[in-house]
Amino acid sequence: ILSTSPDKEGVIQLDKETIGECMQKSILRYDDSSEHYDTISAFIKSLRGSDATAATYYLARMIDAGEDPKFIARRMVVFASEDIGLAGNGALSLAVATFEAVERVGLPEAKYNLFHCAIALARSQKSREITDLMNEAFALAHKYPNSPVPLHLRNAATKLMKDLGYGKDYKWQAGFQHEKGFLPEEVREESSNR
């Protein structure tokens, strides 16, 4: 700062480069929204690509830039279901525990939790099954929003409802497969064609 010349009014103007030189470390350019989104995108894509080294690099950059650690943890919670899903059911529990640790512990100590989770997510098997089934379910629900629930699946809370066939032939047991299935007929026909 002492080597910086003052302006016409005698004021020394400080910019990022000058401050960075004083701190003897680089300051991450994180001053616009595109850098924020580009970095989190690279982080998530590194997790998806099973590259723990790249994921931790982008994680360190975000932390150094002052990114909200809860934002990072939230993204890992979503990633655990979206990209790992049923291939690693423990991933969601780890990500949620990481979010809670970040909330309770805070930085700088929560860095350990964030890195632990990121490395584990990167090394986990990946599956898009949840995402694919969710998208299919919403597509069917949007196409058939008012298809009536089949009678055998309806709640038979009264004698009249039972007389109308509500809940008929339904058995309450694990793995019970009703001959008419569990979807409205028009939805069942389309879903079996997928």
Q: Model features per residue range: what roles?
A:
Residues K16-R61, R74:
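Conserved helicase/translocase motor-coupling segment
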